[in-house]
A protein has these predicted regions:
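Acidic, low-complexity intrinsically disordered segments
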Residues: 1-231
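Radical SAM enzyme core and accessory elements
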Residues: 1-7, 49-54, 58, 374-476
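Conserved strand-turn element in the central/C-terminal portion of the radical SAM core barrel
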Residues: 38-41, 272-275, 300-309, 321-346, ...
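Hydrophobic residues within beta-strands of alpha/beta enzymes
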Residues: 60, 97, 120, 236-238, ...
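Non-cysteine beta-strand/loop elements that form the S-adenosyl-L-methionine
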Residues: 61-64, 125, 282-300, 362-368
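Catalytic cores of alpha/beta
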Residues: 108-115, 281, 341-355
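Conserved, mostly hydrophobic/aromatic
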Residues: 148, 238, 354, 373
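Radical SAM [4Fe-4S] cluster-binding motif and immediate context
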Residues: 170-332, 352
Length: 476
């Protein structure tokens, strides 16, 4: 038996999309699969004890979606909880433990070593997990499992990442309690592709999902949405890095949803790059059921867009917002303030531009999470010794370790960058302001983890992207 455990206990709860894909893919190879969902358990320790008293798996797989919450100043790190979970499982079962997931794939070696797991899978888990199960049954062949981290003669070995170019994923989505997830989480995720060919300064998606976009067949995506609709789930959100990269695939997905008239039955939200985005794609998305877009704007300063390696220009962002207005799609722009080279002037330029648009809301995050292997590390190394960099923000002591939540805020924004940004926003309620760094500061940002207002709104019946729900709360 293969036991798959959802470890994500963030609230509102998000259904474990990747775990569902892995479970169905494993079943297709003849493996008996059982799922323990700690995401919905009120007492996870009791759930673990009860489960392993009744089951004796051959392999235990843990999905690890988030290494941390990626927000400063909260900087919540979830790896210690994962380590505690592995320790508890060791007491209850002798089965080997394998860890996978998007968050895991960014820090695969570090996590395997830190939590003392037997195996890890970097990249796509659908084929690799089943391959590992059968390799264990044979007692050999670990070197052939794509993405596998494994030990041989006491040495941790790492196979090439599991990023198959032919991306085909299961569509049934029937291994977790979607009704409860929908009632408590307000939406359900789905994927149209994985990977990203862009090299934005800060982004870890190419590290976790692959350096090129790998697309699913549009018919497969539509089949999955129909399966979720049959379970009563009619509000969805893409899990893609950017839905419109590549544009022709986004159009093909929309065309298939329109052909099946799914746009009349489902509401969905998406993350998009600012370009490519035109009237044809906007129209197609709206007809296919899209009701909200979150653009990765980052900045509205030419200097900062160049710093972040964004290909769009300021006027492209304004045009994207206007197109959403014209077709009736609600629109959010996420900003990333405080990167290398940010000044009072560039931040003011960005905020003034967004205030002059007809955007529904703006996320004004003020700090950049630093991931190893990204351009952010290279940029900071060019500034001198990282240990002495005055822009670093962290809650831990000792040597700088990007495995732990470590952020950068340009020193040019002063000693209280959140206050500076709030002054620039000047009370415009469309902006989710950054939270100040003081311990007793009121939370004003759009960190969704453990957001009591959001949890209460969903419990009361709100459905949709979390920024859209919070926006509606502000407008009441």
């Amino acid at each position: 038996m293969l036991t798959l455990i959802n470890t994500n206990r963030m609230a509102p709860p998000i259904s474990p999309v990747g775990l569902e894909y892995v479970a169905e893919a494993a079943r297709r190879t003849g493996i008996d699969v059982s799922v323990l969902d700690l995401g919905l358990s009120p007492a996870p320790d009791d759930a673990l004890r009860d489960y392993f008293a009744r089951h004796t798996p051959s392999l235990i797989g843990l999905s690890f979606r988030n290494v941390d919450d990626c927000f400063w100043p909260s900087a919540q790190w979830f790896v210690p909880e994962l380590r505690e979970l592995v320790t508890r499982i060791r007491v209850l079962s002798d089965a080997p433990v394998v860890i996978g997931g998007v968050g895991f794939s960014i820090f695969a070696e570090r996590i395997v070593q830190h939590v003392d797991a037997d195996f890890g899978i970097r990249g796509d888990g659908e084929g690799a997990t089943a391959a590992l199960y059968w390799a264990l049954a044979r007692g050999r062949g670990f070197e052939k499992v794509q993405g596998l981290l494994w030990r041989s003669d006491g040495v941790l070995r790492s196979n090439p990442p599991a990023w198959p170019s032919d991306l085909s994923l299961p569509t049934r989505r029937d291994v977790v309690d979607h009704a409860t997830y929908f009632a408590r989480g307000g939406q359900c995720g789905f994927e149209t592709k994985r990977g990203c060919g862009r090299r934005c300064l800060y982004c870890a998606d190419p590290l976790s999902k692959g350096p090129v976009a790998r697309v699913r067949r549009p018919a497969e995506v539509a089949d999955e949405i129909e399966s979720l609709l049959a379970q009563g789930i009619d509000v969805l959100h893409t899990c893609d890095a950017e839905f419109n990269l590549p544009r022709d695939h986004a159009m093909a997905v929309c065309d298939e949803l329109i052909r099946r008239r799914l746009g009349e039955r489902v509401r969905w939200y998406a993350y998009l790059a600012v370009t490519p985005f035109d009237r044809e794609l906007a129209d197609a998305m709206r007809r296919a059921g899209c009701v909200g877009i979150n653009f990765t704007g980052d900045a509205a300063s030419g200097l900062m867009l160049n710093t972040y390696r964004q290909p769009h220009r300021v006027q492209d962002l304004g045009r994207a917002v206007q197109l959403c207005r014209e077709v009736g799609i609600r629109v959010m722009v996420d900003l990333l303030l405080g990167g290398p080279g940010e000044t009072h002037e560039t931040a003011a330029e960005t905020i003034a531009f967004l205030k002059g648009t007809d955007v529904d809301c703006v996320g004004a995050a003020c700090a950049v999470r630093i991931y190893p292997g990204t351009g952010m590390v290279e940029a900071l190394e060019r500034q001198g010794a990282i240990e002495q960099n005055p822009g670093l923000r962290r809650k831990y002591t000792g040597p700088v370790d990007f495995f732990r939540p470590t952020f950068y805020v340009s020193p040019a924004l002063g000693s209280d960058p959140a206050a500076l940004v709030k002054d620039l926003i000047a009370g415009d309620e469309r902006f989710f302001e950054p939270t100040a760094e003081q311990p007793d500061a009121e939370t004003t940002d759009h960190n969704y983890n453990d957001n009591a207002d959001l949890v209460d709104a969903i419990r009361a019946g709100a459905r949709g992207a979390y920024w859209d729900i919070l926006l509606d709360l502000r407008r009441r």
